[in-house]
C-alpha cells in the first residue's frame, strides 16, 4: 500500500524563529529546525512539533512546500528524503536534491516575459526590495522585508504606494509577517503541487494526500 503524502509548509508550521517563540508565543524551543547563513540555530520546533515531524517522516512521505529558496531549504535541519517544492513553487527538487528538469523548462518559459519587469521594479524601489533568483540568473520574484516587526505599517504603506505605481497585472502580492512579495502568477505553490501529484499518481496510483500550512499561499494546496 502506498504511504500517504503529506505536503507541509515549513516556517511557522513545523518550526518558527526563537524570537517568535520566546517573545510572542511564550513557547520553549526544543529542537533546531533551521540554521542561519552562519550555521547558527535560528528556528526551532516545540516538543510537540518535533514529535509530529518524526512521526510524519516514519509513517508518511513528507514533502516540504515552502517559500524558502534552494539555498535556504538546505539550511533546514529536518532529514527530508523525498521531493521538495521551494521558492513559492518555482523549483521542484527531486529526492536527489536536483531541480526537476521538466518543471525547470516549464518555469523558465513562464518566467521569461517577467525578467525585464522584475528588474525595473527592483531598480526603482529603495534598498528594502530585492529579487530572488533561481536556475542561475533567472529572477523569480521581488520581496520587501523589514527587520523591525514593530514597524510593519511602514512596510505596508510603501507596498501600497508601489501598487499604485506598478500595474499588478500578471502578478499577485503575498503579504506575510515582515515581508511583502510580488510574485508572477505562474509561480505558485498550488500549481507546483498539482503538477507533482499528477506525476506521482501516474507512477504509483492512488495515495492519500494531506496538506499543512499557516498562510493563504498554503491554502492553494
Predicted features along the sequence, with ranges:
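Active-site phosphate-binding/coordination module
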Residues: 43-127
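Active-site neighborhood of HAD-like aspartate-dependent phosphohydrolases
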Residues: 1-6, 10-64
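Conserved acidic, metal-coordinating active-site core of Asp-based
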Residues: 124-221
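The start of beta-strands in P-loop NTPase/AAA+ ATPase cores
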Residues: 4-6, 81-82, 209
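Short loop/turn segments at strand-loop or loop-helix junctions that form parts
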Residues: 8-20, 87-89, 95-97, 136-137, ...
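Short glycine-/acidic-enriched loop or helix-start segments at secondary-structure transitions
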Residues: 17-18, 24, 73-76, 95-96, ...
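A structural signal for short, well-ordered beta-strand segments and their strand-loop junctions
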Residues: 7, 63-66, 84-86, 132-134, ...
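Short amphipathic alpha-helices and their capping/turn segments at secondary-structure boundaries
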Residues: 1-5, 73-76, 161
Amino acid at each position: 500500500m502506498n504511504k500517504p503524502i503529506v505536503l507541509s509548509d515549513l516556517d511557522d508550521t513545523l518550526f518558527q524563529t526563537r524570537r517568535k517563540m520566546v517573545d510572542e508565543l511564550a513557547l520553549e524551543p526544543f529542537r533546531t529546525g533551521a540554521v542561519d547563513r552562519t550555521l547558527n540555530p535560528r528556528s526551532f520546533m516545540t516538543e510537540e512539533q518535533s514529535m509530529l515531524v518524526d512521526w510524519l517522516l516514519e509513517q508518511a512521505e513528507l514533502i516540504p512546500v515552502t517559500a524558502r529558496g534552494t539555498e535556504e531549504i538546505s539550511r533546514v535541519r529536518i532529514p527530508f528524503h523525498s521531493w521538495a517544492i521551494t521558492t513559492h513553487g518555482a523549483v521542484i527538487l527531486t529526492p536527489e536534491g536536483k531541480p526537476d528538469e521538466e518543471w525547470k523548462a516549464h518555469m523558465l518559459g513562464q518566467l521569461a516575459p517577467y525578467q525585464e519587469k522584475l528588474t525595473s521594479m527592483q531598480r526603482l524601489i529603495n534598498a528594502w526590495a530585492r529579487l530572488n533568483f533561481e536556475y542561475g540568473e533567472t529572477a523569480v520574484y521581488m520581496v520587501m522585508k523589514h527587520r523591525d516587526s514593530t514597524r510593519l505599517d511602514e512596510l505596508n504603506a510603501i507596498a501600497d504606494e508601489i501598487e499604485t505605481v506598478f500595474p499588478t497585472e500578471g502578478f499577485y502580492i503575498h503579504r506575510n509577517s515582515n515581508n511583502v512579495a510580488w510574485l508572477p502568477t505562474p509561480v505558485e505553490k498550488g500549481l507546483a503541487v498539482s503538477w507533482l501529484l499528477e506525476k506521482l499518481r501516474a507512477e504509483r496510483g492512488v495515495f492519500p494526500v494531506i496538506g499543512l500550512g499557516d498562510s493563504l499561499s498554503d491554502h492553494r494546496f
